[in-house]
């Protein structure tokens, strides 16, 4: 597992500034679980970092991103319907950049459908590609061609991605990504990948920053938080992590989701 830190992309920021007469606006809509909501907050943070403002209506935007969910077929159909509804807007605003990311973008048949049937979709990238968004936008602005990445899972965790949190009271804090359980009914391991745990020091630093910023309810996120720590060099499990976070002074509540009962230990229960 490789751990890297997000870096500001000066080239992308300069290209964004040059491409628009007025400061550009981005509309980001996230579907699905809390992990997707948190990913959406980080996507917004990355966009602001390279010069975009944020807006609440797609018709006001210079860039539209749908951060998608693949757990239910109905959610996928909603996304395709919403993407299809943008065709007319794209015709009115040829410079509009339309993108799709998230779990749906980690499925080959979805990427191929977008490639063949939605020629006005400009950007496609998966759940592991948030940190590459500035590079993809720069490529689109430079070459004026579609940038549709084939599904791929990166054995990497990127720290310090900028974030624009939606609440000043509640905060999401990912501690791990992916799942190794491969339940018959669930697509998560195939689109989110195998389990990857963040280093405890990085989690603690982000947690302390949230407490110091005044957040009162902090929810630890993972597809299976009970299996936190597997694969780390440091011997630590989820109960150890909870004890570590509770050493931070302050007035706050810790919540977590989601968990698998087979990984719930007596140590955690105690």
Residue ranges and their predicted role:
Residues 98-100, 107-109, 212-270:
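Conserved SAM/AdoMet-binding glycine-rich loop
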């Amino acid at each position: 597992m490789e751990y890297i830190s997000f870096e500001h992309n000066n080239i992308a920021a300069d290209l964004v500034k040059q491409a628009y007469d007025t400061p550009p606006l981005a509309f980001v809509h996230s579907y699905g679980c809390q992990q997707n909501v948190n990913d959406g907050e980080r996507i917004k943070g990355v966009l602001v970092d390279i010069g975009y403002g944020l807006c609440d209506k797609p018709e006001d935007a210079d860039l539209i991103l749908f951060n998608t969910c693949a757990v239910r077929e109905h959610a996928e159909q909603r996304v395709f319907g919403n993407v299809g509804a943008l065709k007319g807007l794209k015709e009115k605003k040829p410079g509009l950049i339309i993108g799709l990311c998230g779990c749906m973008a980690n499925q080959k048949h979805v990427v191929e459908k977008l490639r063949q049937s939605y020629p006005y979709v400009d950007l496609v990238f998966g759940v592991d590609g948030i940190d590459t968004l500035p590079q993809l936008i720069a490529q689109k602005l430079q070459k004026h061609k579609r940038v549709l990445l084939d599904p791929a899972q990166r054995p990497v965790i990127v720290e310090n991605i900028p974030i624009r949190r939606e609440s000043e009271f509640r905060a999401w804090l990912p501690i791990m990504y992916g799942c190794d359980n491969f339940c018959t009914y669930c697509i998560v391991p195939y689109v989110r990948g195998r389990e990857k745990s963040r280093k405890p020091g990085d989690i603690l630093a982000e947690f302390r920053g949230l407490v110091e910023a005044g957040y009162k309810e902090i929810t630890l996120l993972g597809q299976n938080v009970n299996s936190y720590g597997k694969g780390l060099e440091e011997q630590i499990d989820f109960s150890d992590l909870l004890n570590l976070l509770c050493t931070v002074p302050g007035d706050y509540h810790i919540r977590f989701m989601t968990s698998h009962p087979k990984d719930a230990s007596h140590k955690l229960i105690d």
